[in-house]
């Protein structure tokens, strides 16, 4: 018989830097989950990723105080800002442009994000990422 699910916890945790301090500790503690067990497992799984890159994670809490977690790909905005070498998007995205990225960079981001996107094919994923970039005030060259 399957375990009874008591809830889901959604967090964004920096890769390789999970520790019991907020927001992780309180979120897991109020459900009675083992905080250190999660931190060790998460840090082990994110070992190969760039340290500090925020990773969305969905933790499924069970009635017997056990848990499982699913890691998603980093947010598209983080990857776009990194590719454009900027710290934040434009406050007026359609009038003030803050940077530019090439189609090749957009395709690389789309490849990374493909698992989490609802796009049917690679071209649709590229258009989705390009739209996100444009809404941040970043021009997409070659598209």
UniProtKB/Swiss-Prot annotation:
Pfam families: Ribosomal_L11 (PF00298), Ribosomal_L11_N (PF03946). GO terms for biological process: translation. Keywords: Methylation, Ribonucleoprotein, Ribosomal protein, RNA-binding, rRNA-binding. GO terms for molecular function: large ribosomal subunit rRNA binding; structural constituent of ribosome. SMART domains: RL11. It comes from the Bacteria. Gene3D superfamilies: Ribosomal protein L11, C-terminal domain, Ribosomal protein L11/L12, N-terminal domain. GO terms for cellular component: cytosolic large ribosomal subunit. InterPro entries: Ribosomal_uL11, Ribosomal_uL11_bac-typ, Ribosomal_uL11_C, Ribosomal_uL11_C_sf, Ribosomal_uL11_CS, Ribosomal_uL11_N, Ribosomal_uL11_N_sf. SUPFAM superfamilies: Ribosomal L11/L12e N-terminal domain, Ribosomal protein L11, C-terminal domain. One or more lysine residues are methylated. Belongs to the universal ribosomal protein uL11 family. Part of the ribosomal stalk of the 50S ribosomal subunit. Interacts with L10 and the large rRNA to form the base of the stalk. L10 forms an elongated spine to which L12 dimers bind in a sequential fashion forming a multimeric L10(L12)X complex. NCBIfam families: L11_bact (TIGR01632). Forms part of the ribosomal stalk which helps the ribosome interact with GTP-bound translation factors. This is Large ribosomal subunit protein uL11. The gene is rplK.
């Amino acid at each position: 018989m399957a375990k009874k699910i008591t809830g889901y916890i959604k967090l964004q945790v920096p890769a390789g830097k999970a520790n019991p301090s907020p927001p992780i500790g309180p979120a897991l503690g109020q459900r009675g989950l083992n905080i250190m067990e999660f931190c060790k497992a998460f840090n082990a799984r994110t070992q190969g990723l760039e340290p500090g890159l925020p990773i969305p994670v969905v933790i499924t809490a069970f009635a017997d105080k056990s848990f499982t977690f699913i890691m998603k790909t980093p947010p598209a905005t983080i990857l776009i800002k990194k590719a454009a070498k900027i710290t934040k998007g434009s406050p007026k995205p359609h009038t003030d442009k803050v940077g530019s990225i090439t189609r090749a960079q957009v395709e690389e981001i789309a490849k990374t994000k493909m698992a989490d996107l609802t796009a049917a094919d690679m071209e649709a994923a590229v258009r989705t990422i390009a739209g996100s970039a444009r809404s941040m005030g970043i021009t997409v060259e070659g598209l």
